[in-house]
Amino acid sequence: MFDCSRHFPAFNSAKTFLQVLLGFIRDCSHPSSDIQLDHNEPLYIVELGAGSGKFSYFMIKALEEMTAVFDFPMRKIVFVMTDFTENNFNFWRDHPSLKKYFDSGQLDAGIFDAVEDTSITLWKSGKTLKAGSCKNPICIVANYLFDTLYHDIFQVDGGLLKEGLISVGSKNAEEPDPLDPEIIQRMDNRFRYNTISPASYYTDEEGDEEHFKRILLWYKDYFKNTSTGASLLLPVGAMRALRRLGALSNNKALVISGDKGNNHPEQFSGLMDPHIALHGSFSLMVNYHAIGAWFTSKGGFALHNPQEEASLKVSCFVLDSSLSTPGDTDWLGSSLSEKDTARSAKYPHLCRAFADYVDSFGPNDFFVLQKSIKEDTPNPPLRTVVALLKLGDWDPDVFFKFRDCILNHAPTCDQKLRNDLCRGIPRVWDNYYMMDMEKDIAFEIGRFYYGIRDYANALYYYTVSSDTVGMHHVTFHNQGLCHYSLGQLDIALALFKKALALNAEYEKARSWIEKVERETHSLPGLGSKVACLSLLDSDDATQFLNLSEIPHDVI
């Protein structure tokens, strides 16, 4: 259902975005702020293109945990999930992790097509957010969305501004089925470039004509004397969507966005056709610099992460119409960055949060770190993995990636490190947002507790696994091992038989049935109360632990 080709460290990013949002609210709460908050009115946080809802869940969960430090009544904050498909909406509506937030009114949802919609009708409250209806600034979160919206192609060549036009065909001479989705893998794109005038290119942009013209003139001026020229995309789809959303709150808005893209003009040097990435659909690099220029032209400002080597760029934008300067004609060269610097000085908490949580060590850095530990270190130390888990606040995806290291080393690590794991592992499950059946997090947590001989907790999570993912013969088998270790032979035998009933070829269950039956018959009268005589301390301990297997052959 969902595009899983993008890598976004969700929980780490959600907390980062929330810290930036908190900084913005603190600045708006100051008596001297140009944007005054009304504590009697809702403050809407809207995620565009929420997809599976996983990021929304992490954000509202983190928001709930920060209630004590938020400078705004938590009961008046409403997180709104949006997407353009009914399927995604239905998935959120029925998701058990979101239910309590929907029931409380803290979470709402609505269909919103970023290409054309001008309002959002909320499912739970029945309210419609439309132009001028939001008294407080609207806070917008957009991850991996802008790269899929409309872009215009431009080049600066020999001091001339040119528009790029694309003709799309197939590499095959004929396509029997023009609706075949695999055609996207055979796209044959041809580009041509025609000289244009920036002043007259955009003529119907609902009041944004002057702002778009300023952006084009800025790029033409910046690259006019370069021998290499420049190639750039103007994310008009993103800017049009943000224009319509900004209108909901009378042009008072905060936008936080993460995507693959560029935020410095030097990254556009050279004449080349735009790169089109294919991943089930297709997408383009987001020109965050241009989006920032649009905000600045409208009276706002932009904060960009200056890190150049990053697959995920995060930028923050503020729209504050009170900062606009009517009659200002200075929009070339360094004037944009100078305006950003002057205007952002009125938002010190926002700037500090962005510097601390994005610039210093942001979502991309976390992704790079965990990827390097996973791929470049064949056998990472357990202490390193625990430190990474703590840095990501026990993100279930990180736990799943490093489950083998945890399961292999937890039974033999020192007690202090094991205690650290035991304090954090419950949060892994607390943070879990189920999307599919491929990652059985509860089962893996059960394996962890089984490995450290905490059979009661192991049984609990094995039961959760059966309830959430479904019955599996290995889960029943492992439950049987737990009960055997607790001396509950009758229950263990029943579970081994359940495992064999689900998979008649599962020889390990058959062997354990024979073993338990022999022991039961040799100890008459003790039944289920027979004690397990320190089995894991015997020479068979390693073999015994190895019987706790990964279900469905997932590695």
Predicted features, each with a name:
Residues 1-44, 57, 87-132, 207-216, 439, 459-462, ...:
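S-adenosyl-L-methionine
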Residues 52-72:
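Conserved SAM-binding loop of SAM-dependent methyltransferases across substrates and taxa
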Residues 70-71, 76-83:
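Conserved SAM-binding motif I beta-strand of class I
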Residues 123-158, 227-240, 249-255, 261:
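A short SAM/SAH-binding and catalytic strip from SAM-dependent methyltransferases
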Residues 142, 147-206, 276-280:
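A mobile, often basic/glycine-rich helix-loop segment
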Residues 212-467, 471-477, 481-485, 491, ...:
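Rossmann-like AdoMet/SAM-dependent catalytic core
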Residues 484-494, 516-541:
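Alpha-helical linker/edge segments of TPR/alpha-solenoid repeat scaffolds
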